[in-house]
């Protein structure tokens, strides 16, 4: 990676898949298995996370995490998620072979709410608080 990549956090998509995730305490939480782009809004919507070791019975299950819930550590080339292992295990998930309806805003809204993130859709649309500031 170049110095600019480290400074600005711009990486090829192929480097995101498989990237390690830890919490601020340094506990291994898992890896990015897949990520989903919202073509309507032009946003990286959420990542599907496979859990790290220590979670019996979780093989084949993925957990949806809003992309904006992650921070990036260029030194360690890892993503940081401010949750503990149990909270991630209890988060909205789905089977690796049975994805949810990817366009279901109600389901995705529950994912964003679980991680205390504001859903990006609707931001800046007519009548919204953000639209008035533009």
Predicted regions and their residues:
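Peripheral interaction segments used for macromolecular assembly
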Residues: 1-134
